[in-house]
């Protein structure tokens, strides 16, 4: 670790920026894992601040930390397509083990071993639910961008699974809200997200 902290950080950044998401789908504007993490972090901080304006008490700093590290394991595993990742329990377990080893190696090379717990619980707990929701919203954003802005109909098939996934993630955040205003706000976002998905599906023809 001595004398190589910056190069280790640079290496992690470069590798994440080189990893492309949606490897089984042709994109007009390809997205890297680093770009995705940045989107999730920005959305998480913005939603956290907005929710706190209604009297909620989400930890904005922790949301930023969790979201900024949540996919760093893909340096070791790559962006694995869901059909492959979940084809068998044994494959899923092997990939999970590889992810953990990769993250430990990365953080050890920088000397921030304590950050492992932040990554490992990135979508757990109250603040992690915000990260999980924004992870899903970042996918919706990409599908919307490709379909509605660039006319790429190839990615439309992602809309259905995204809608199902977001329903659960919105519900998870609603369950963590302590104020009526926060609950109503998240519910309004769910309605807005469904309208966006409808606009995506309308481009099928």
Question: How would you label these PLM feature ranges?
Answer:
Residues 42-48, 60-80, 132, 136:
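Active-site alpha-helical segments that house and flank conserved acidic catalytic motifs
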């Amino acid at each position: 670790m001595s004398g190589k902290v910056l190069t280790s950080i640079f290496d992690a950044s470069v590798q994440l920026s080189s990893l492309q998401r949606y490897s089984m789908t042709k994109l007009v504007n390809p997205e890297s894992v680093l770009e995705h993490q940045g989107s999730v972090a920005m959305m998480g901080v913005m939603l956290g601040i907005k929710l706190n304006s209604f009297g909620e008490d989400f930890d904005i700093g922790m949301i930023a930390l969790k979201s900024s590290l949540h996919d760093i394991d893909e340096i070791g595993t790559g962006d694995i397509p869901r059909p492959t990742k979940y084809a068998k329990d044994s494959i899923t377990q092997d990939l999970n083990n590889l992810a953990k080893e990769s993250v430990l190696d990365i953080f050890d090379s920088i000397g921030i071993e304590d950050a492992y717990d932040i990554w490992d619980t990135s979508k757990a707990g109250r603040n992690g639910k915000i990260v999980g929701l924004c992870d899903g919203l970042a996918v919706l954003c990409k599908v919307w961008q490709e379909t509605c802005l660039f006319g790429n109909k190839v990615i439309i098939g992602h809309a259905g699974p995204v809608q199902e996934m977001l329903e659960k993630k919105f519900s998870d955040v609603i369950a963590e809200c302590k104020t009526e205003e926060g609950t109503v706000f998240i519910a309004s976002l769910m309605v807005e997200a469904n309208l966006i998905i409808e606009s995506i599906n309308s481009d099928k023809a």
